[in-house]
């Protein structure tokens, strides 16, 4: 297999190794190539200095993995031992390294708190798990992290957790201790260590993720989907009841589990109905599929599961909702829909075309029709004829209007919502109306125009 070595954080070169090649042997190969003493080399991978006795396989190095090798003078014995460096180590010390390696970190237990209801069985707190841990650290047979790979995979994939120095941005930082929860990984400056690059005093740790499905370069990073985890305990999906893996775990009190296919369908359905929730802090998000309170998804990259086309719609709708929440309007011309932020009280709105986005349409902010003088209601009223020599019978003029019948029908079957003024058509049925706008949803009475109440229900629920 091939591993790529970056020497002193500069250039990189490939080295051919076997799975049973030791770290000491890797140092000797690099030392011979670079013309430096092997005992001055330190091998850094995934936030830890690799001890000499471990093999490539023990260190979880995979095909085309990138390791950093730095040349630094040997430090005092107690410092070297503490970092797992050049001094010989016992098997138990090697096991300690394995348990602290980023390649063995498992944060899935922190997706669910110990006091969660209904799905606490997914936690690794039972006696079986404890007994397995007592036998010593082993590489997980499941994926601990998941990411969305924007390319070349374009889908959810297993992820690899890595760390770099916050100062020089090189993956040469050795952690003082490994992360124990998602906050350690996601919140900046929570973890520290020591950068092994020459002349770099950096101590801040910056974590990042890479796609585990294909070889990656230093710059190929992905965002972690911290709600997605392997379904090791065979929890059925809340929607289809099938047992699938991986699954998404909502952050509600019950930690409801949903498979990724059902989550995709849930998102598309809500998107089609424009039923996403606009949160001032989080943005355009969705709660638990069961409607649990305080369960909005905080990491919006989870909606990448929608796929490119639907995700583009999601971004567009989110931007539109943001404009509306800010008191703006959307251009009503079909095919445009540009977001506009006119001055407060400004009734005449122009969809500016200078920025390449607007269409130039001038419309009324209140009724969303082409701009007009006077009240919006006057658009549906017959306009008075101006003084002229040729006179016609008023009654005949009213009966001869081609579009008047349609306007009269609109008057009779359409009324504005009392709260948001969106026109709503009544096509038979009772007087109980509900505004379809996601940000309004007012339930009101068609007959009296007020919010729906028991008096309306008793007096004219089914008035014709």
From Swiss-Prot:
Residues 233-464 are annotated as: TRIAD supradomain. A zinc finger (IBR-type) spans 312-376. Residues 80-96 have a biased composition (Polar residues). Residues 1-76 form the Ubiquitin-like domain. InterPro entries: BRcat_RBR_parkin, IBR_dom, Parkin, Parkin-like_IBR, Parkin_Znf-RING, Rcat_RBR_parkin, RING-HC_RBR_parkin, TRIAD_supradom. It comes from the Eukaryota. Disulfide bonds: none annotated. GO terms for cellular component: aggresome; cytoplasm; cytosol; dopaminergic synapse; endoplasmic reticulum membrane; glutamatergic synapse; Golgi membrane; mitochondrial outer membrane. Residues 70-96 are annotated as: Disordered. The modification Phosphothreonine is found at residues 80, 174, 216. Zn(2+) 1 binds at residues 237, 240, 259, 262. Zn(2+) 6 binds at residues 445, 448, 456, 460. The ubiquitin-like domain binds the PSMD4 subunit of 26S proteasomes. The RING-type 1 zinc finger domain is required to repress p53/TP53 transcription. Belongs to the RBR family. Parkin subfamily. This is E3 ubiquitin-protein ligase parkin. It comes from Mus musculus (Mouse).
